[in-house]
Design a protein with these regions (language model features):
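Catalytic histidine-centered segment of alpha/beta-hydrolase-like enzymes
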Residues: 144-159
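C-terminal alpha-helix
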Residues: 161-169
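Active-site loop signature of alpha/beta-hydrolase-fold enzymes
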Residues: 21, 123, 147-150
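Conserved hydrolase catalytic core segment
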Residues: 1-24
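A structural signal for isolated positions on well-ordered beta-strands in alpha/beta enzyme cores
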Residues: 12-14, 114, 140-142
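Internal catalytic or translocation cores that form aromatic/hydrophobic pockets or channels
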Residues: 16-57
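Conserved alpha/beta-hydrolase catalytic His-Asp/Glu region
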Residues: 41-96
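Conserved serine/cysteine hydrolase catalytic core
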Residues: 74-135, 143
Length: 171
């Protein structure tokens, strides 16, 4: 959208730990837990699963994980809980893996943007982030310590940084 015919609809763009090139190993890691919906007996079991699988998100408060469980789950007909998303979301990663390299579209983005990267991210590698900052819309870069893919941007220091970035992008 940001590089297409409707690009003028977007006035600022925050990119959270993703880029125009995605490493196969990171895609395989994500596919290992996204393809089949797990089942949980209760919210406590679901929170344990979420905290484990999404540990790369980095440190987050208990309130964050409780909210994530409340907003990420749905009750099945059999009374169990499961994640509330379309498991076919993975089709984009398996059907057209060659399209996960889209530097040409990156070059076309003209919208002011900023890039957040988890310091231990396996999805947005340091070289990819550096290349992004030197090409296309040339975003600013904020690296979030103690996390991989993807930073939650939910703790007070991250929220403060995000607000500052948004203020600067809107100028």
């Amino acid at each position: 959208l940001a590089s297409g015919r409707d690009a003028d609809r977007i006035t600022a763009l925050i990119i959270n730990d993703i880029g125009p090139e995605l490493p196969d190993a990171a895609i395989d890691r994500i596919l290992s837990y996204v393809g089949e919906l797990p089942k949980f007996a209760d919210f406590a079991d679901a929170q344990i699963w979420l905290r484990t699988v999404y540990a790369p998100f980095g440190p987050a408060s208990d309130l964050f994980w409780q909210r994530m469980a409340r907003t990420s789950l749905r009750r099945r007909d059999d009374g169990q809980l499961t994640l509330h998303y379309d498991p076919r979301i993975t089709a984009q990663f398996t059907a057209s893996r060659h399209e996960l390299r889209s530097w040409d579209r990156w070059q076309d983005i003209r919208t002011p943007c900023h890039l957040f990267r988890g310091a231990q991210s396996d999805l947005l590698l340091p070289d990819t982030a550096a290349r992004m900052c030197a090409s296309g819309p040339r975003p600013g870069l904020s690296e979030i310590g103690d996390c991989g893919h993807a930073p939650t941007l939910s703790n007070p220091s991250d929220i403060k940084a995000l607000r500052g970035v948004l203020r600067n992008l809107r100028r």
